[in-house]
Amino acid sequence: MPSVSDTDTSLRFPILIGDIGGTNARFSIVLDANSEPTEPQIVQTANFNTIDEAIQAAVLDRSSVRPNSAVLAVAGPVDGDEIELTNCPWVVKPRQMFANLGLSDIVVLNDFEAQALAVVALGEEHMEKIGGGTPEPNAGRVVLGPGTGLGVAGLVYALRHWIPVPGEGGHMDIGPRTPRDFEVFPHIEKLEGRISGEQILCGRGLVNVYRAVAKADGKPAPFTTPAEITGAALAKTDPVAEEALETFVTCLGRTAGDLALVFMSRGGVFLTGGIAQKIVPALKEGNFRAAFEDKAPHSALMRTMPVYVITHPLAALLGLAAYARNPSLFGVQTAGRRWQA
């Protein structure tokens, strides 16, 4: 198991930072406490058998800089010396990385912990507001993002630190509510008999919803990718795609509202990832905000909570960089998640 004091937060520069999702992995290097991350290297996880191979090819083989430490954010729970990713066959093995990559200190976080850190690191110029009032500066926040899966993390301020709260909230149940939902939901692909957030609120989830809408109405479903469905829906050229995206947006609003209540997110709710960035028009024009606020008896409270879409394409890397430069600013618990050679 990891062996390092949780109170010893400092890391030796240069520091490799990596945001490892189910489909893509993004890497950069923070040279010192005052520098911005180097030009990011982005790879598809399917192109490499292991994360070690990806780091070697994308970072080490392209730079003369040799990192001493690494801060990695992975899509999945961090547990034990071999960390499996939820939507990717890679297994992160920090002790093996010492030998293979020459690192001496590795911290592994949840990918949406990094997104939560990014909320603190980014300015409002990298955010698009979707209704609500003015955020309270030190109030609770929540981050969620549909991508390969559905990531969720809370963010709370306590003892003068921002503390990310990682979890697997993307696997919460989602159920039908309206009469139309009850027509469509029986056709949504289930996972071991249940419909969780990741069966709807991610790329493949949008495809699931699109096919379910088509089946419910006995119509053809020629599109096979989230990009095709989103493009047709936003262009208003395919009614099935339009309804699928509207259902997606509505379910996202309901789920975001539920999570906002859990974390009492008067500091804001933040949507992140490529899907959220691409569907901003649908989020603004559709039922997202109404679904978000429809939480009786707390609808008035919900109307005050602002929602933002994070528009920076590499937000998680910036969050990791902020942490790498000065870990003591954040209340990140590294016990059980930090390895030293």
UniProtKB/Swiss-Prot annotation:
Pfam families per record: Glucokinase
Cleavable signal peptide: none
InterPro entries on file: ATPase_NBD, Bacterial_glucokinase, Glucokinase
GO molecular function, one term: ATP binding
Recorded family membership: Belongs to the bacterial glucokinase family.
NCBIfam families associated with the record: glk (TIGR00749), PRK00292.1-4 (NF001417)
Name of the protein in its database record: Glucokinase
Species assigned in the record: Mesorhizobium japonicum (strain LMG 29417 / CECT 9101 / MAFF 303099) (Mesorhizobium loti (strain MAFF 303099))
Gene name for this UniProt entry: glk
